[in-house]
Structure formats: structure tokens, C-alpha cells
Design a protein with these regions (language model features):
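CN hydrolase (nitrilase-like) catalytic-core segments centered on the catalytic cysteine
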Residues: 78-98, 153, 162-279
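A short, polar/charged loop-to-alpha-helix boundary motif
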Residues: 128-142, 277-295
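Short, glycine-anchored, charge-dense loop/turn motifs used at functional sites
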Residues: 112, 116-123, 263-270
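Active-site beta-strand/loop signature of hydrolases that rely on acidic residues for catalysis
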Residues: 15, 30, 38-68, 90, ...
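N-terminal glycine-/serine-/threonine-rich phosphate-binding loop
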Residues: 1-48
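Short beta-strand scaffold segments in enzyme catalytic cores
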Residues: 99-101, 113-116, 144, 260-262, ...
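Active-site-proximal beta-strand elements of phosphoester/diester hydrolases
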Residues: 12-24, 113, 125-128, 145, ...
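Cysteine/selenocysteine-centered motifs that mediate thiol-based redox chemistry or coordinate metal-sulfur cofactors
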Residues: 153-177, 181-183, 289-327
């Protein structure tokens, strides 16, 4: 683990997390939404604002695109227009911004990527480790942990990356005090009969006439209740803050459930939104909660010499794409 005490560190950090309904393929509209939220976050004194997975390009419709269509939507990083705009926005408003889109990599390879733009002009990119959205989108092969200007250390894991406990632990062991966790989740098709499942689009379309019905879906087993089965444990067991951002509303043939929230190192929800629409929450992180959090204590009791079998294939591993689309 990287010792935190050796790095200059602000005692508190104000963060913002956003949920919004991305428009498929409409990067201009989606960036305009992002820019409006950045202005609001900066006005409220946030030093970090987190946006959802693939919020610039759109998400679930990607699986139906041809390779040519995907290539027309994807952009290189750091030389593409969305990267440059995000970088300029971070510098203009003196705030760190995280946002996602489809990256055009080398040799015709694509990635589900997330860029963190710092106000000093620096950039960090995370490629989703467990990507499944399109046959041409390949998973990344590196963990991403970075230093924020305020001295805090943050890691990035995209959606399915957070499902695997090993990924969060490895991020924590690299010194992450904050996990930036952009998602497009909730309301998903699944073979599990006890959680998730598709939300009837008519309920979403009638959300103003019947707000109680959509609230029950977003907060129930297809949304927040499912998140509460596992998301707090990622923060608690690894002694870190978790900034969860998500899509909300129509995402091709599914309905995303929002519930943008921030959790502390004890797995407690510091602030969240239950709004059935675009929304942002802002809260302060207290570094004083980190050193004696249960997860930090547990990690100091690790016995690494016992854990070599974790890196040995069992023969039961499958591609995440096969697992996802066999559901």
C-alpha cells in the first residue's frame, strides 16, 4: 500500500456526482448537459465532478452498431475533440472532471474509456477492464490510480469493473482513497430472479403523472435496493470513499435507475438523489474517516503470502461478453 501520510493532503474535499439521460450518438447534446453540470458543480465549490460511463457517446445502443458506425462515433484519446473540450472545461472552471465515451484505439481496436481531466491540464484515462458492449470493444489491461491536485488519491473503475472485488482491492492497495465509479446500470436484463430486471418503459414515460410508480422501480430491487446489496461493501471493505455516478432514464430498450450517491469508508451513504431525471449531489469528504476505518484496519492485517491462488486460473473463467449476453 502507498502510505498516505507521506503526501500533502487537504483535510476535506468537496465532490459532485451526476446522473443524466444520455442521448444515443448525440455527442453535442450530451456534452452540453455535462457542461451545464460542471458549471453548477464549480459554483457550489466542488473540486471533483463525476459523470456516468459512456455519457458522451451514449451506451446501450452501442451493441447494435456496425463496426463502421462504431468507428464513426469513437474518438482517439488524448487527441480527440471530446478530450480537448473536457480538458479546456476543467481548466476554465478549475475543477477535476471525469467523463466517459468510446475510444478509438490503435489498429482498429475500440475501448469503453473514461477520462479524468485535471485543472492543471493533466489527463488520465481508464479503459474498462471488463468490457462487453460490442464485439469490437476490448477490455483494458491496467488499473488507474491518480493524484488529485488537493493531495487525495483516486482510482477509477467502470461499472462491471466494480462487480469484481479483486479490482477494488487492487485499486485500494495502490493507495486510492476515493473510487470514481461511473456506471450505466439498473433496470438490466438478468437471469437472476431476485434482483434487477427490466423496467416497463411506460412507467418512465408516465413519471410525472405517477411519480410513485417510477420511484418504486428506481428505489426497489431493480435499482437502489440492488446496489445496496454490494456497493457499500466495496467502500467499507477497502476503507475508501466511493463516488457513484449513473445513467438515468431511457437507454435504448432499458431504463437506467440513477441513484447517484457518495459513500464513506464505512459504507454509509453520505448523500444521494432519488430523482427520476437528471440530477447532481454535492458533499464533502472528510479525510479523518480514512485511517481508522474498518477496511483500512483489515487491509493492514493482510497476509499476502497466502493469496497466490487468487492469480491462478481455475478453468471456470469466461469472457464477460459471453456471461452478459447469455443472460
Amino acid at each position: 500500500m502507498i502510505p498516505r501520510k507521506h503526501r500533502p493532503h487537504a483535510r476535506t474535499l468537496r465532490v459532485a456526482t451526476v446522473q443524466f439521460e444520455s442521448q444515443p450518438g448525440d455527442k453535442e447534446s450530451n456534452f452540453a448537459t455535462l457542461e451545464a453540470f460542471v458549471r453548477k458543480a464549480a459554483y457550489q465549490g466542488a473540486r471533483l465532478v463525476v459523470f456516468p460511463e459512456c455519457c458522451i457517446t451514449g451506451y446501450w445502443f452501442l451493441r447494435n452498431l456496425t463496426r463502421k458506425q462504431l468507428a464513426g462515433l469513437a474518438e482517439p484519446i488524448p487527441d480527440g475533440p471530446s478530450t480537448r473540450r473536457l480538458q479546456a472545461l476543467a481548466q476554465q472552471h478549475d475543477i477535476t472532471i471525469g467523463a466517459g465515451w468510446v475510444e478509438a484505439g490503435r489498429a482498429g481496436v475500440f475501448h469503453n474509456s473514461y477520462v479524468v481531466a485535471l485543472p492543471d491540464g493533466r489527463l488520465h484515462r481508464h479503459r474498462k477492464l471488463h468490457a462487453f458492449e460490442h464485439p469490437a470493444i476490448e477490455g483494458g489491461a491496467e488499473f488507474t490510480v491518480l493524484d488529485l491536485p488537493e493531495g487525495w488519491r483516486a482510482g477509477v473503475l467502470i461499472c462491471y469493473d466494480c462487480n469484481l472485488i479483486e479490482n477494488v482491492r487492487l485499486t485500494a492497495l495502490q493507495g486510492a482513497e476515493i473510487l470514481i465509479a461511473p456506471h450505466q446500470t439498473g433496470g438490466c436484463r438478468t437471469r437472476n430472479p431476485h434482483l434487477m430486471g427490466v423496467i416497463d418503459r411506460r412507467i418512465w414515460e408516465r413519471r410525472r403523472e405517477d411519480p410513485g410508480a417510477i420511484r418504486r422501480e428506481l428505489r426497489g430491487e431493480k435499482g437502489r435496493a440492488w446496489l445496496m446489496r454490494w456497493l457499500p461493501s466495496r467502500a467499507h471493505d477497502n476503507g475508501l470513499f466511493l463516488v457513484f455516478s449513473n445513467g438515468v432514464g431511457v437507454d435504448d430498450d432499458e431504463i437506467r435507475t440513477g441513484n447517484a450517491m457518495v459513500l464513506d469508508p464505512y459504507g454509509r451513504v453520505l448523500k444521494e438523489t432519488s430523482r427520476a431525471g437528471d440530477a447532481m449531489v454535492v458533499t464533502d469528504l472528510d479525510a479523518g474517516l480514512l485511517p481508522d476505518s474498518t477496511g483500512q484496519v483489515w487491509m493492514r492485517a493482510r497476509r499476502p503470502e497466502l493469496y497466490a491462488p487468487l492469480a491462478v486460473p481455475t478453468g471456470r473463467e469466461q469472457s464477460v461478453r459471453k456471461l452478459k449476453f447469455s443472460e
